[in-house]
Amino acid sequence: YLRVATTVVRHEESAGDPWGRAETANRVSVMAEEDGALKVVGQTPDLAQGERIFSSRFVGRRGFLVTFRQVDPFFTLDLSNPRDPKVVGELKIPGFSTYIHPVDENHLLTIGSYVNPDGGWQGRAIKLSLFDVSDFAAPKEKFSQLVGSSYASSEAQYDHRAFNYFPEKGLLAVPFVDWNAAASGDGYWSSFVSELRVFHIDTQAGITGRGALSMSDVYRTERYPDWTYSWSPQVRRSVMADDFVYAVTDAGLRVANIADLSAPLKTVRFEPNAP
């Protein structure tokens, strides 16, 4: 069976508006091959009208879905009967998750954005959450942690390959970018923060920061016939091996011991870009 989570947009006529009004609804469809064609054999009712899907995850006979408009409805789905998928539980919390990662049978680790329920830009941050789904009808956000300022972002929020969970040690590494307006120094890049943030994940103790491996001083140089430009790229990927973690940007890579991320052991800078 193929399971697909979709946001459906319908355009409806609206008095005084020549373009009409767009209405959204969300659903999970189960598809199977019948008579040589792929057909929908089961489908949930429309969910969270007026919102759109930000993330989904299917694990065995269970499914998880996150939609968003102002708060984050987190849905649990029973997919044991492909022809009759059902919503079992729902949890509403501020913000939204953009990637869902199973930790074990009863816990999910997510990354996304915290959004102030009152609206506005201030108060936003990267959000890590640990969900308890042992009671499938009543999921709980067991732990959460806000990371960074309103300017913060992480490539892991929109590319799951940047989300690096190392289950043997219970460690999570994610790229982190922020803007520190209070930083001293001249020029734009003195306030730019590019790091690999590392967290310890424990289903009983929660989410604990282990520190950051900074890449802010690893610059990429672009050379042109009449001028040269250097800039600090964001962290794109990471690798964890034994007691070491590697941070990778478009400008180079750096390694540190996880026990002391503030003391890099080696930095390799890539060659400047030639025209």
Pin down the residues of each PLM region:
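Feature marking well-ordered beta-strand scaffolds used for ligand recognition
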Residues: 1-275
